[in-house]
Amino acid sequence: MIEASKLKAGMTFETTDGKLIRVLEASHHKPGKGNTVMRMKLRDVRTGSTFDTTYRPEEKFEQAIIETRPAQYLYQMDDTAYFMDTENYEQYEIPIVNIENELKFILENSEVKIQFYGSEVIGVTIPTTVELVVTDTQPSIKGATVTGSGKPATLETGLVVNVPDFIEVGQKLVINTAEGTYVSRA
């Protein structure tokens, strides 16, 4: 059992009614009057729906034991993404609604880890940084580095990130997958 005050983003727990929930955001909130509460943004792992809720810090939940296996992202069709276990070549289907954030960072044939809750496939874990190529951005303007505000760039997965002014189409960038931000040129 784990207390609500110990839950952090990325953790998965099971509610008393059997729902498998992943924490997207968690923060302590102390109202002017009353007791401290935990404000959380959560996702139902099975349905993909997200919701906001509050819990008392002492509320307890059953922490879900999630196992991972190495896999390769194959392709997506309709509303399903397909992955292959790289050890036993078994293929798995995951509804896109459950992993739409992760799909912004991975290309076909990328290495990931598939998450299992018992024998049920519930999601994927991606690397903390990925290398992606810029497919569209505004041209660099000489002397425009003074402002330092950057410009939007579209990457090969369709993700749009803010990049420095010197970045051009065709360059490979390192992207932080947790925040969806530019780190450096590759």
Curated annotation (Swiss-Prot):
Function noted in UniProt: Involved in peptide bond synthesis. Stimulates efficient translation and peptide-bond synthesis on native or reconstituted 70S ribosomes in vitro. Probably functions indirectly by altering the affinity of the ribosome for aminoacyl-tRNA, thus increasing their reactivity as acceptors for peptidyl transferase.
InterPro entries reported for this sequence: Elong-fact-P_C, NA-bd_OB-fold, Rib_uL2_dom2, Transl_elong_fac_P/YeiP, Transl_elong_KOW-like, Transl_elong_P/YeiP_cen, Transl_elong_P/YeiP_CS, Transl_elongation_fac_P
Protein name per its UniProtKB record: Elongation factor P
Annotated HAMAP family: EF_P
Involved pathway(s): Protein biosynthesis; polypeptide chain elongation
UniProt entry keywords in alphabetical sequence: Cytoplasm, Elongation factor, Protein biosynthesis
Family: Belongs to the elongation factor P family.
Regions that span the bilayer: none
Lineage: Bacteria, Bacillati, Bacillota, Bacilli, Lactobacillales
Cellular component, GO, one term: cytoplasm
Organism encoding this protein: Streptococcus mutans serotype c (strain ATCC 700610 / UA159)
Cellular location(s): Cytoplasm
GO terms classed as biological process: peptide biosynthetic process
Gene: efp
Primary residence: cytoplasm
Record-level Gene Ontology MF annotations: translation elongation factor activity
